[in-house]
Regions:
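Conserved "HGTGT" condensation-loop signature of ketosynthase/thiolase-family condensing enzymes
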Residues: 1-76, 100
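Conserved beta-strand segments that form the floor/walls of ligand-binding pockets within enzyme
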Residues: 4, 79, 110
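Cofactor-binding loop segments of dinucleotide-utilizing enzymes, especially the Rossmann-like FAD-
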Residues: 8-10, 83, 142
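Short glycine-rich or small-residue beta-strand-to-loop segments that form or flank ligand, phosphate
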Residues: 76-83
């Protein structure tokens, strides 16, 4: 069996923090300095009640909506990568599996590997496919780093946002 990506999509929270917003909090920096240093102008930030699993769930729902040829009941494994899990048990992948209405026979696994997580997720998915364990893997990522960063941590606040 050949492993390949059928479709990709994303979900962004509504709240946007701009470089201008950050300069108001950290006046020792300029909009230009932030843009030149990190190449980012806007960061999407999750609402207080919005979780990493919520963002990933929205991305998955969007994927199924944008690609009707991909059927939910064809997914037999879900992988969810996050550094900012909502809770320890149950795993977020299981919660997402249930909310999407995926088959109960579908495998579900959370993993966390920082910035390299997506690449490792692709490798895990490929292994599941080539090993004959799964035929269709749904790989999701979701992060709400903003909930874990100190408000005065300008280095990380200029780089990280939230998304699924």
């Amino acid at each position: 069996m050949k492993a390949f990506i059928k479709a990709i999509t994303y979900s962004l929270p509504d709240l946007v923090v701009t470089n201008e917003d950050l300069v108001r909090e950290f006046p020792e920096w300029s909009v230009e300095k932030i843009a030149d240093k990190v190449g980012i102008n806007n960061r999407h930030i999750a609402a207080e009640n919005e979780t990493s699993a919520d963002l990933a769930l929205r991305a998955a729902e969007k994927l199924f909506e944008e690609h009707p040829e991909i059927k939910k009941d064809s997914v037999d494994f879900i992988l969810f990568c996050t550094q900012s899990p909502d809770y320890f048990l149950p795993t977020s992948a299981c919660v997402i599996q249930d909310k999407l209405g995926l088959p109960t026979s579908c495998g579900a696994l959370d993993f966390n590997l920082g910035c390299s997580g997506y690449v490792y997720g692709l490798s895990l998915a490929k292994g599941l496919l080539l090993g004959g364990i799964a035929r269709n893997v749904l790989l999701l990522t979701g992060e709400t780093y903003s909930k874990f960063m100190h408000p005065k941590d300008k280095g990380n606040r200029t780089i990280f946002g939230d998304a699924g």
